[in-house]
Amino acid sequence: MSKQTQDDIRRIAKEIGEMVVAKNIAYGDSAVDPVRIFSKASPVEQILVRLDDKISRLQRGTSYPGDNEIDDIMGYLILLKIAKERYGDE
């Protein structure tokens, strides 16, 4: 693997990590620690639903202006890994 590819991987991983932290602060950690007012689904299941929605938008070409579905999917996958580490596969 080239040094450029290694650098790109590190740069993008850092950018996605910073985006996830910022959004998680803005949303009050709702992905990993939901308040469960209406939905009683586990954090893992809720994140999977959000991933389904993002992938559906990509497939159908119906993204919202300003959204970056690929970055959001990568972010949800990070949150999914965290939720599975904390709660298992519930």
Where are these regions (language model features)?
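Intrinsically disordered, low-complexity regulatory regions
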Residues: 1-90
